[in-house]
Structures are given as C-alpha cells and as structure tokens.
Amino acid sequence: MLLSETHFWTTLREDVVRIKSQDLGAFRYLRQRDKEQEQQDLACLAKRDYTERRNGLAVLKNSGRKSTGRLKDNLKKLEDLLRQHRIIHSEWQDAAQVLLLFSHGLIAHICVDIYTGDILRMVFEKYLVGKLASEVITDAFFTRSHIVLAYNTNQLTVVHLQRPNARSQGPEKIANMDPRIFHVIIPGATERKLSRHLTVNASFDLFVVWTQSSQNEVYPWRPTIRDQDRANIHVFKIKGLQLESIAYCWSENDPLCVDFLRSSESQIITLEQKVSRKGDISAEICSYELAAGKMQRTAITSIPMGAQICSFAFSPDQEKLFLGSVDRNICLHDLVQQSTKYANQIEIVPNQCAWHCDSAMLCVANERSVLQCFDLALATIGHQLVSENVTPSSLLDLSHYFVAQPTLLSVAFSRKPDLSTFKHTYAQTDCLLLLVYEQGPLACMRIFGGTGMRGDIHNSGLTADVIADKYLRLQQPDRAVNVLAALNWETYGAMCLITLHKIANYVFFGGDQRRPRIELMARALKTFAHTLSEETKDEFSDQVYDLKRRFCFYLLRKNLFAEAFEIAQDVADYDIFMDLYNLTKCISSLSEFAQVAFSQAAAIIHEEDRANGNLSLTCDLRSESACSLSTCSDMLRGQGAGTAPETGLGASQPQSQQVLKNYVPPLPSFKSKVFNAEMIKINIPKPELRPPLPKVSIAPPTSSLASLTLKSNSSLQQAPAKSLHPNGNLWSQDVPDQTVGLPMASSPLPRLPPSNIPDQSAQLGQFSTMPASPPPTGSYQPKFYQHPLVSGNIPAMLPSLTSEDYQKRLLQKKPTASILSNPANPAPTNGEAPATPAKSQTAEKNKVKFSDTIQVAVVPEIPRKEKPMPPKRNGYSRPAARHLTNPKKELADSLPLCHPNDEYLKDFNPITTNVTKPPIRRREEEPKSSSKGGNSSSSSSSIKVVHFGVV
C-alpha cells in the first residue's frame, strides 16, 4: 500500500552498503572513479540514467559554486564525524532541513530535496566547540532565538541569538547572528550525575528540565537541602538573557516523557512508568497545572503494560499515545476518548517509533532496520520499495543492504511541508523518514504512497481519509471503518465526514451487495455518537442525517426490513415508517412488523403535533417520501369506495390506515450552509387570486394510539363533506401547489356524486370536531395596508371600504408625478403650462401615465424576530417535521425575501385611499416667489420614493 525508496547518504561502495544494480528502490552516491569503473555495466548505466532523468543525484562531485559548497568533501567529513562522535540530538527543523548535534558540540545542517531525498547542501557549525560547561551533553533544543544545552550535571548552557536568521531557506552561521553565551546552575542533586532532558513549548518561552525520579532511593538527610534540589521536574521561563524558575515537582515514578500541552501551555503532560511491589508494570499519564510556583497534578490515567516499555511517542496532535514493550506488545491510547487498543505479539520488537506528521500513521522499527507501519486502528499497512513487481508486505527489511549490520538509533518523520515554498507540477512526495545508525551511515526514505501534494483534505500527506480511501480501493472496507472509528469527530469532523461519504459510496455503488458491507455501513454511521458536543452536532448532523436516510431507503430496496427499521428508529422520520408499512403490509409473514411500523409513524405524528402545539389531525398529513406518493383523487376514490359506514375500532383501523398512507408529499425542504432559501426568488401571486386559508379547529389530545388513528379517520372523512365549493369541486381551497409550495387557485378535480360520500357523523359523533368552513369566495375581500413613506412602525390594519366609497376616493385622488421624470426640466402635464415667463403654451389634454396608476411605499424597518431553534431528536438537530401540511406555515417558509414572513404579503398590497396622505404641494398653491425669479426652471413636482426593500 505504501510505496517508497531509500537513499543512503554515503559514498562507500562495498564497505558498508551493498546495493544491486537492478534494485530501483535503493540508492547510494557514486564517486567519479566508481563511475568510470561501471561504464561497462549496462545495468548500472541504466539505473544512473533512471536517477538523473528524475532530477536525482547519482554521481557525487564538488561544485564550484560557493552556495552549494563542496558536497563530496562535506559528505566524507560527515561520515568521519559519525564514526568518531555520538549524535546527541537530531531533528527536522522543517520539511527539508535536518539538524544534527554531536557530542563535542559540532552542529551539522543538511538541506534535503523533498522530491528526490538527495542532499542539496551541508553546513557545519563549530561555534559551540570548546565552549561547553561540561564534558557530556545529554540533550538540547534549538529555537529561532535561543540554543539551550543540558548536561549530566545541574548546569545549562544558553546561547541567545540577538539577530535571528532572517533567511527563508538554508542555515546561517551562529557568529553572524550576534550570539551571547552564558552558563546557568539550576537546582538539583549535585552528588549524582543524571542525564537531563529538555522540552520546549510551542511559544519558545517556557521549557522543562527533567531527570529520573529518586523517591524510591535513600538520601542522606541534611538540613541544608531544599525541595527544589529533590525535585526532578523543573520549569523555566526564558526571555532574552534572563532565565527564571517558574515551578518544580517531584514525580512519584520515573518519567519517560514530559511535554507541554498544545491546547494550553500552562499545563504539562507526563508519561511515567510505574512498577508495583508485585512487579506489575504500567504506564501512567499525568497532567500538571502550573500555578503559584508549583505543579499541581490534576489528572492521572493508568495503562497496564505487563512488560518494560521500550518505545513511546505522543502523536503530533497529542490525541494518541503509542506504547511498545519488550515482549512485542503494543498499544494505542486515545487521550480524548479515553480508550486503549492493544495488538499482541507483533513481528518485531518495537525499539524505535515515530509518528507521521498527519497523526494518522506511525512507524516502528527494531535495531536491525526492520520497519512496520500501523494505522490508527493498529492494523498493519503494506509497505514495499519501488520495484518492477508488486510485492507489498507488512514488514520492510533493510538489513540486507548492510555488510555489517549497524544498530538503528532513531527514526523520525519530516514535518509537514509548506506548499507555498515548494512549486512543482508533477512531483509527488508525502514525507521523508530519517534513519540514524550508530557510527553511520544516514539514510532517508522518501514515501510517496499517498496522493502527493494534492487530493486530500490537507493537500499533502497521508491523512486518515487518504488511508481509508486506499483501503476501499483494495476491497478492505472493514479497515476503512476501523480508521473512521478511531477518528475524533470533535477535532477531525470534516475528515470524518469525508471518510463516511467514501464508505457510503463504496456500499451504495459497489458491484456485489453483501450483508457484511451493510453491517459495516451501519457501524460507520454509529461513529457519529449522541455524546458529541452540541457544536459538532449542529455542524455535521444534517449531512449525517441525509446519509442515514439514503442508507435506510437503500435497505428498503434490498428488502432488508429489519435493518431498515433499526435505522428508521434512529432517524425518527414519519415517511420511512410509512414506506416500511407499505412494503410489508402485503407480506403475510410480516403483518405484525407492518403494524409496528404503522404505530411508530402514528406515534411520531402525535409527538411532533404535541410539540408544535397543534393537537388536531384534521389537517392534511402528507409524507415526504416518493415511495408513498399519491394524489388527492386517489384519496377521494379510496373514501368513496366504501358503501356502508362501519362502526367500532376494528372497522375504523383499516380506513385510517388507508387514509394515513395516501397523503401527497410536499416539496422536500433542506438546510444547507451554501444554498439557502434566501437565494430563491419566488413570484408571489396577487391577493385577488389567493384563496383564504382554511381554519383548523383545536381538539383535545387523544389518550391512546387507537383513538388517534380513529380520530384522524373521522376528521378526514368529514372534511370533504363540509368543504364543497359552489362549483362542485372538492377541497378547492386547500390543495397545495406541489411545484412551488404555495396554495393555488381552485383547480378542477374529478367530480364525485354526493351519494358516494358516506356520512359518519352519527356513528363517530364522540370523536368528530366542528371545523369552521371558510367564507365563500364571492364574499371574500382582501384587507389592505397602508405604509408610511418614511421609516417607522407599520400601523394597524384599517377597515375595508365599500365599492362606492372606493370609487369616490379614486376620483378625488390627485395624480402624482412619475419617479422617472426629470425634475430639472419637467414636461407639461394635466393641462398646466410650464412656469417659464418668456414662453407660454396652450393647455394639453390630460394623459394617463404609468405613475398615475400605481402607488408604492417604502417598506419600513421591522425588528427581526428570533427564530426558534429546530427541535433536537436522538442527540442531533435536524429540520423540523415536514409531513404536517400547514398552509400558513408553508407560505411563510417559502417567502424569505423579507424577514417578517407572517406579515410579508401586506407590503405588496394596493394602498387604500382612506388614509391621510402626506401633504402634496400643488402647483397652484406654490408661492409666487418661485415664478418671479430669473431662472427658467419650473417648480419640482412631488415625487414618491420607490424602494422595494427594507430602509
């Protein structure tokens, strides 16, 4: 699954590293004399050509450029240093630069090409040679402005760089950065020489010095010894040339690792190895809070191991902790979910371990250069070097490349590359793995088994969604689901959602539909647990909710009713249970199952109806699903088919089922952050064409499910008899327009004889309600509103006028000027002459203009109403119930152009004339001073402001 190639940074041919000419997965540098000797070998020529055509470095030679340096001589010097001195500290300073600190104080900077794994430049720094406070260096850390060295005594060497390196790439000489070096004596035991270790925080202003604990050892009592000297963990603050002690602590057990929390730099997390009196070994994770000069332990977690811990590492995001023991057992502890996974008896002893920079993969190795990679579920990842054959294996053995097997000291992945600094169109790389051997050589493994610098959520690397996608391509969906289950929705929500979608597409569109895949999909959906935070649920619940609905209908198409019922209980939507009922009612063996599904649907309706405050089911109950699609005529035909009314619960139950399953579904509503309702423009019908809203009566809540279905049957059968239109059509005023979601005008429906409509009011009188019939269409008069032309509150509704008064008002109304007229040079209107003293014209005949027939108003600012939060069910929020058809609510929801949706239509109604208008200055009443002036401009007409928005 992972593809890589190894570059050995050495020029020694047969003395240390032995690589065959046919091996295209391992490389080493050739000297000029080696090149001349291999001219006769065609395989060597082909491999060298293969390397150079890919911008690789095959033959090492000195360059005349000063910036590049003498690379061949520097590499030879590096190999001599590796044989003579120990490496105290090694780290990746960025994605393409390695820093090595040797025991005598020399620093080596190695610049690496991330696309090939070759050395670009090498610089040696000798500033610290001869300036050490002690002979043995145990640890060090390097920041942009400080270098701190620790020894096996209670001393520190601090180098302050007053002019840090301003170069974006490449190292800089310490002497050019104005260094200031000083030595500090820190608290601690002076009688014993213990190795001091250093850890710095992300802000580079606090660091920790820690050693082994000595609580189990016997100390000679002295009255002058302090608690600071007995403590083994010390926290210091560094700023410029000042070093200040902040806090200290004496741990109960020997710490293996001490680090600062990334989320809070005032907290420290430690990993300690505890050995009980019985000899049981466990790992304890402790967190400390820095307060008032002391370290207070706030939490502790114990992980049983059973054997001595030989390798450990926190993930870069500090959510996972890897532990390996000498008995070949490994475990992965989740610090967020507080869960631990174990893998017993792996194939190698995990002496070294390293996390990938994306925190989705880790690599373990033994001392003989045998590597093994694991994902977040502790499943082995196949790994192989570049070859002509596809031979992935769980183990990658590099030991056969060495003549004398060296000891592998450490492995370390490079940091995440900054894509802005690397511009390459076709090259691919995921990371570099540095292998440090005792007495050399150094090796660099370039892994490009991922998607390169594009394709995943972070645009580079081996993230969890990339690994899961590779598992799906290899027909291993169980491993992909395990990776998803190991992710945390709180911190990697987007990555979890992408992985969940990939698994869903694999299940829905896979060639062979097997039951194990369906079980894996159900398990993947359960990773979005109800225990997540409200912020995470609000952000991802809609997408997960849609996937659950898709999966439920997928199960229905496969006739897997039991699994679909389980998902339907989690989704809790009415239409899914009705689809289950419609599909299983005709199967005799599933009759009880159908009744349970029907009762679940009725219970959901009753629950949501009670939550909405509307306990009457006389309104239309319609489904959302296309599986239960029907028309109103089908419902009427189903009601008219009955020849005689029946009484009792047993008679009303089939009728209620027939009515409940034949409702017309409205348009599906959805909630999206990208495409919302405010982007939809809807043409509002005129008030004259809009029918009145039906009045719905309020009935007391039913006491049982049986009475609920009986009540719904009686109410729905009474509605047609009392809703007859004078033209003979049934339900002519409450049939919604399914194309727009708004009530439409009366449309012709199939006429039914009155004898086909049974009258059940006598039999079911105790359950019947008295719904008020809507007023006739002929007597319906829309009420108009008048809005002022200035910003303010909208006045209350005004009384309507009779037709005679309305005509009188129209005759008395004076026409106003058009807003499109030019006030600087107005045209003569209404028989008036322009106010020009030099020229007079005869009066013209009155003309009807567009501005004289329309009056418009400015919609004033209306305080926005706080929208209620959607109801939460099963731990996540989703859109409100959409199967209950409320015409008034649907009309308000479909008008997003103005925020007070319930008062939206009044802003577009014609303005009545019985309201006192603002005074209009007529031209006859204008002062004569306007015409006495010498200007030729006429008096400006009064113009009404038009604005179809909110002021």
Curated annotation (Swiss-Prot):
Belongs to the WD repeat fritz family. Residues 709-720, 757-771, 818-828 have a biased composition (Polar residues). Keywords: Cell membrane, Cell projection, Cilium, Cilium biogenesis/degradation, Cytoplasm, Cytoskeleton, Membrane, Repeat, WD repeat. InterPro entries: Frtz, WD40/YVTN_repeat-like_dom_sf, WD40_repeat_dom_sf. Residues 930-942 have a biased composition (Low complexity). It is found in: Cell membrane; Cytoplasm, Cytoskeleton, Cilium axoneme. It comes from Drosophila melanogaster (Fruit fly). Probable effector of the planar cell polarity signaling pathway which regulates the septin cytoskeleton in both ciliogenesis and collective cell movements. Functions cell autonomously to regulate wing cell hair polarity and number. This is WD repeat-containing and planar cell polarity effector protein fritz. Residues 709-776, 816-883, 903-951 are annotated as: Disordered. The lineage of its organism: Eukaryota, Metazoa, Ecdysozoa, Arthropoda, Hexapoda. The keyword Repeat applies. PANTHER family: HOMOLOC-13, WD REPEAT-CONTAINING AND PLANAR CELL POLARITY EFFECTOR PROTEIN FRITZ HOMOLOG. Pfam families: Frtz. The gene is frtz. One of its GO terms (biological process) is cilium organization. WD repeats lie at residues 304-343, 345-384. GO terms for cellular component: axonemal basal plate; cytosol; plasma membrane.
